[in-house]
């Protein structure tokens, strides 16, 4: 019995992390086996790599170095946490996965979507998300949310200029055109309760198609 791999994607400030935690609580309350995790991170080695990637003092980091570090963290996270959970038949909710690398490093950093896809295919093999929920929000609104959130520690990506975040959004559009069958777009500018409702609807539809 295989599990269900659901990834949450979107630009900075879209609110996907908050919604993911809500989804975990709702699904767990229904008695479903759920594993919630994040990238980069989720396990000790990947969390250590995360600290290097997002450290705001690492301003000299080369774009290729950044892409390779993400892929390395992804591989370890996948092998140590995601794949075992899926083999156990669990629902895995993951805050970011390969599409973040394609949008951020492939497009916004200018490395090329195909090039970054190649790096990540080596890292993840044939393990791709069953469903990807994209939280759509204008870059200006996302940055505004980040700035007004005093409880959020600003990382290196948060501090990028508006132009970069605009490119990230464009990158996601390119990625969604490439993998339309698994992407579901949600308007993340709506009230949190409505966004949660929309995300739950996507997940429930996916659950109907499998037997957990």
Curated annotation (Swiss-Prot):
It catalyses: dTMP + ATP = dTDP + ADP. Transmembrane segments: none annotated. GO terms for cellular component: cytosol. Keywords: ATP-binding, Kinase, Nucleotide biosynthesis, Nucleotide-binding, Transferase. One of its GO terms (molecular function) is dTMP kinase activity. The keyword ATP-binding applies. GO terms for biological process: dTDP biosynthetic process; dTTP biosynthetic process; dUDP biosynthetic process. Pfam families: Thymidylate_kin (PF02223). InterPro entries: P-loop_NTPase, Thymidylate_kin-like_dom, Thymidylate_kin_CS, Thymidylate_kinase. Its EC number is 2.7.4.9. ATP binds at residues 10-17. Belongs to the thymidylate kinase family. Phosphorylation of dTMP to form dTDP in both de novo and salvage pathways of dTTP synthesis. This is Thymidylate kinase. It comes from Bacillus velezensis (strain DSM 23117 / BGSC 10A6 / LMG 26770 / FZB42) (Bacillus amyloliquefaciens subsp. plantarum).
């Amino acid at each position: 019995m295989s599990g269900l791999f659901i990834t949450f994607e979107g630009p900075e400030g879209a609110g996907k992390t908050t919604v993911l935690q809500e989804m975990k609580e709702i699904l767990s309350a229904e008695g479903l086996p759920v594993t919630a995790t994040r990238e980069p991170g989720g396990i000790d080695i990947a969390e250590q790599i995360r600290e290097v990637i997002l450290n705001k003092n690492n301003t000299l980091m080369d774009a290729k170095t950044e892409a390779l570090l993400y892929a390395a963290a992804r591989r370890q996270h996948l092998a140590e946490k995601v794949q075992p959970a899926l083999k156990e038949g669990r629902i895995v909710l993951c805050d970011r996965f390969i599409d973040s690398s394609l949008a951020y490093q492939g497009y916004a950093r200018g490395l090329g979507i195909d090039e970054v896809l190649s790096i990540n295919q080596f890292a993840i093999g044939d393990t791709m998300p069953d469903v990807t929920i994209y939280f759509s929000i204008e870059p200006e609104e996302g940055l505004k949310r980040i700035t007004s959130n005093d409880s959020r520690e600003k990382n290196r990506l948060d501090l990028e200029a508006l132009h970069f975040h605009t490119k990230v959004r464009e990158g996601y559009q390119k990625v969604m055109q490439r993998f339309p069958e698994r992407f579901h777009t949600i308007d993340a500018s709506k009230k949190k309760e409505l966004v949660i409702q929309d995300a739950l609807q996507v997940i429930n539809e996916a659950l109907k198609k499998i037997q957990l």
